[in-house]
Amino acid sequence: MNRKKIIVAAVIVALLATLAYGWHYYRQQNDASLTLYGNVDIRTVNLGFRVAGRLASLAVDEGDDIHPGQTLGKLDDGPYLNALKQAQANVQSAQAQLALLKAGYREEEIAQVRSEVAQRQAAFDYADNFLKRQQGLWASKAVSANELENARTARNQAQANLQAAKDKLAQFLSGNRPQEIAQAEANLAQTEAELAQAQLNLQDTILLAPSAGTVLTRAVEPGTILSASNTVFTVSLTDPVWVRAYVSERHLGQAIPGSEVEVFTDGRPDKPYHGKIGFVSPTAEFTPKTVETPDLRTDLVYRLRIIITDADESLRQGMPVTVRFPQR
């Protein structure tokens, strides 16, 4: 009986020991800080002018640091200044034309047209009376058929001129048609749009830095004739600084957006940078060869983007880093 109790006790002790070891191992695996490997993300942008022209000057060179809004270069703006002046003149002309149509006709202009109607009425009366005389003479064979036809043609032309003058007077008395005013308004809107485009083109003769960075390459020199979008500078963006790292599926649950991490470099192994996870890729991929990791290259991993919150000039793009998550 005692022997049986001893065996049962031994089994219980062994079972408890196994459970204790398993729990200890589980806690070790979950409490240990997660270590990942990656690189400072390389982000570059090609800068160029949106408009074509002759390069007048460049303000920075390779290796220079730049800040947002800094002037990097200028094109010869002469052609664009001329285009702007022409666009401004077109707008002024369209504004004057619209104002003239809206104001209608002046009394002096109406009086002038009335006088024109009276003159053409007199001319028609004379031509009509002359035709009647010629018709009487034709009946008595005193004029030729050609003379009669010339008189009829002159009377018809005088009648057409009189009708044109009367139509013009009617238009002057009723004012401009709404369609004419609408057309003038549309013409003004078009010239204003052309003016806005001319102003934008002139602004684009100055190349401004879009964000902070470092000039990597200077592709052209002053005097070069550039087409729109030709690369002038290649710039490495330095703000914000991102780290690209990779996490296995087994540890994916620890890589939560917003989680704080520490980032170590070989240059300062005892003084980490601090960052937060900003993005976790929804799709898996094989570990890139550029990442220094002890994991198998055939393992599927998920890409992380870590935003460094206290970056300095020592953190260079492409630099290998070690990312550590704090113990839970």
From Swiss-Prot:
Keywords: Coiled coil, Periplasm, Signal. Gene3D superfamilies: 2.40.30.170, 2.40.50.100, Helix hairpin bin. One of its GO terms (cellular component) is periplasmic space. It is found in: Periplasm. Residues 80-109, 141-209 form a coiled coil. Belongs to the UPF0194 family. This is UPF0194 membrane protein YpsIP31758_2812.
